[in-house]
Swiss-Prot record:
UniProt similarity note: Belongs to the heat shock protein 70 family.
UniProt comment concerning the protein's domains: Neither ATP binding nor ATP hydrolysis is required for SSZ1 function.
Lineage: Eukaryota, Fungi, Dikarya, Ascomycota, Saccharomycotina
Listed GO biological process terms: 'de novo' cotranslational protein folding; chaperone cofactor-dependent protein refolding; cytoplasmic translation; protein folding; protein refolding; regulation of translational fidelity; rRNA processing; translational frameshifting
GO cellular component: cytoplasm; cytosol; nucleus; plasma membrane; protein folding chaperone complex
Entry-linked InterPro entries: ATPase_NBD, HSP70_peptide-bd_sf, Hsp_70_fam
An MF annotation (GO) of this entry: ATP hydrolysis activity
Subunit structure: RAC is a heterodimer of the Hsp70/DnaK-type chaperone SSZ1 and the Hsp40/DnaJ-type chaperone ZUO1. RAC associates with ribosomes via ZUO1.
UniProt-listed CDD domains: ASKHA_NBD_HSP70_ScSsz1p-like
Function as written in the Swiss-Prot or TrEMBL entry: Component of the ribosome-associated complex (RAC), a heterodimeric chaperone complex involved in regulation of accurate translation termination and in folding or maintaining nascent polypeptides in a folding-competent state. RAC stimulates the ATPase activity of the ribosome-associated pool of Hsp70-type chaperones SSB1/SSB2 that bind to the nascent polypeptide chain. SSZ1 is required for ZUO1 to function efficiently as a J-protein for SSB1/SSB2. Also involved in pleiotropic drug resistance by post-translational activation of transcription factor PDR1.
Region Peptide-binding domain, annotated ranges: 400-538
Name of protein: Ribosome-associated complex subunit SSZ1
Length: 538
């Protein structure tokens, strides 16, 4: 059996592994503890090493030997890293100019680990889990990275993987991997603009991606390194701490172990409220010997964390603006990351974005119900795509001249019977490209006008229906005219005429648009019955 190429998503908070099984389907691999979203954490007790969920459990009793939130430190000098991200676990120290950790291994022995070594150990655990599941050695992987990862960080990741016998054959950016996995399961029926919003544990990332003929083009990216699921945990911690303090006059924030207990249980409560309308929290001896038992419903949780949810929505708005697009230019928002399970995230985006924008999250039947597995699945699909390439062929296929293709700045399309513009090739379509459309109703002499198009957003104010003069007097004190409604609509207009083609006595027409690698446009119109064709070039 040949060694499969696996897909790995390595996040600050959690990691996932996937591969293409013998039936040619994507399998997301669970570790020996049954975790598919495997916490990116390592913990040490004496000579024993714990990984994943077992390591996270050590945060309460053994925080100084538990390493968390370390992914973003790879390949960066110590002074460029925000080491406060791992403050709840082992404190970061400078080791050889890099982020490192000093771990107690018992009997007075200490071990200094650079972040490179920590990454190697984490990837090795993922590799072993994959080998155990697949039943054969794993030597190669496609690894996802954020769009803002530097070449130095990628090089360091490759080196850490190579140390444990794992070759990174390709990096794929996280939003493209997630969108690839979504489109494999739920194909887009037309060209679309999609925001991929990844809300993780300690950071949020987003990208606006134009999907044209199956090709992805990133139009803009955004990153907020201080916004994530931990912000929701913090709001719950503060709420529960205040309630506990009111009841017992004891402050659980003052004791590190009490605070760690509260954080761990708040995170569990947050996850429970993603699937249920209420949750209970129960902590033995939270502070000053007092036990804490309480319940919270989803509505209260959403009110407590309302400001954070508003920040998530604003973050999506910001990346759309960065792409110099209007929300009406967006067809869908694909939610990924652990926060995506939270229903309030979806409802907020549905409220702030136009109705035409589909929110593709776990609550949508047209989207994956496991958004935190999308990127790993996409990496596995990319691994399948490149598995037949050798190293030289893959390097050739990834040359900038091939990957960085030119794109249309304006849409190209046809003029309708009433002088309206119908786009065929949308803006941001990469070329070379070919697109066909069939007009079966075209009869007789037929003139085809090919134009560039422009689009704009038109706003109309709809005045409310005024109150009737003879309205019931009882209603008068409570009734008032509604506010005017502003309706926004995306409209196309004709731009520059590119060419005209005429067909006589047509009986249905097929029109083929071709743009070559140099940007030359050829349009062919063919009579469906006779096969006669006319061509125009520009």
């Amino acid at each position: 059996m040949s060694s499969p190429v696996i897909g790995i998503t390595f996040g600050n908070t959690s990691s996932s592994i996937a591969y293409i099984n013998p039936k040619n389907d994507v399998d997301v691999i669970a570790n020996p503890d049954g975790e598919r979203a495997i916490p990116s954490a390592l913990s040490y007790v004496g000579e024993d090493e714990y990984h994943g969920g077992q390591a996270l459990q050590q945060l309460i009793r053994n925080p100084k030997n538990t390493i968390i939130n370390f992914r973003d430190f790879i390949g960066l000098p110590f002074d460029k890293c925000d080491v406060s991200k791992c403050a709840n676990g082992a404190p970061a120290v400078e080791v050889d100019g890099k982020v490192g950790f000093v771990i107690s291994r018992g009997e007075g022995k200490e071990e200094k680990l650079t972040v490179d070594e920590v990454v190697s150990r984490h990837l090795n655990r993922l590799k072993l889990a994959a080998e155990d599941y697949i039943g054969s050695a794993v030597k190669e992987a496609v690894l996802t990275v954020p769009t803002n990862f530097s070449e130095e960080q990628k090089t360091a990741l490759k080196a850490s993987a190579a140390k444990i016998g794992l070759q990174i054959v390709q990096f794929i950016n996280e939003p493209s991997a997630a969108l690839l996995a979504h489109a494999e399961q739920f194909p887009f029926e037309k060209d679309v603009n999609v925001v991929v919003a990844d809300f993780g544990g300690i950071r949020s990332d987003a990208a606006v991606i134009a999907v044209r003929n199956g090709i992805f083009t990133i139009l803009a990216t955004a990153h907020d390194l201080s916004l994530g699921g931990d912000n929701l945990d913090t709001e719950l911690v503060e709420y529960f701490a205040s309630e506990f303090q009111k009841k017992y006059q004891a402050n659980p924030r003052k004791n590190a172990r009490s605070l760690a207990k509260l954080k761990a249980n708040s995170s569990i409560t947050k996850k429970t409220l993603s699937n249920a309308t209420s949750a209970t929290i129960s902590i033995d001896s939270l502070a000053d010997g007092f036990d804490y038992h309480a319940s919270i419903n989803r509505m209260r949780y959403e009110l407590v964390a309302n400001k954070v949810f508003a920040q998530f929505s604003s973050f999506v708005d910001s990346v759309i603006a960065k792409a110099e697009l209007d929300p009406l230019d967006i067809d869908a928002v694909l939610l990924t990351g652990g926060v995506s399970f939270t229903p309030k995230l979806t409802t907020n985006l549905e409220y702030t974005l136009p109705e035409s924008v589909e929110i593709l999250g776990p609550q949508n039947k047209n989207a994956s119900n496991n958004p935190n597995e999308l990127a790993a699945s996409g990496a596995a699909l990319q691994a399948r795509l490149i598995s037949d390439y050798d190293a030289d062929e893959l390097a050739e296929a990834l040359q900038p001249v091939i990957v960085n293709t030119p794109h249309l700045k304006k849409p190209i399309g046809l003029i309708g019977a009433k002088g309206e513009f119908h786009p065929v090739l949308l803006a941001e379509t990469s070329f070379p490209v070919q697109k066909k459309l069939t007009l079966k109703q075209a009869k007789g002499d037929f003139l085809i006008g090919v134009y560039e198009g422009d689009h704009h957003i038109e706003e109309k104010t709809l005045e409310p229906i005024p109150k009737e003069e003879n309205a019931e007097e009882d209603d008068e004190s409570e009734w008032s005219d509604d506010e005017p409604e502003v309706v926004r609509e995306k409209l196309y207009t004709l731009g520059t005429k590119l060419m005209e083609l005429g067909i006589k006595n047509a009986n249905g027409v097929e029109i083929i648009f071709n743009i070559n690698k140099d940007g030359a446009l050829r349009v062919t119109a063919r009579d469906l019955k006779t096969g006669n064709a006319v061509k125009g070039e520009l």
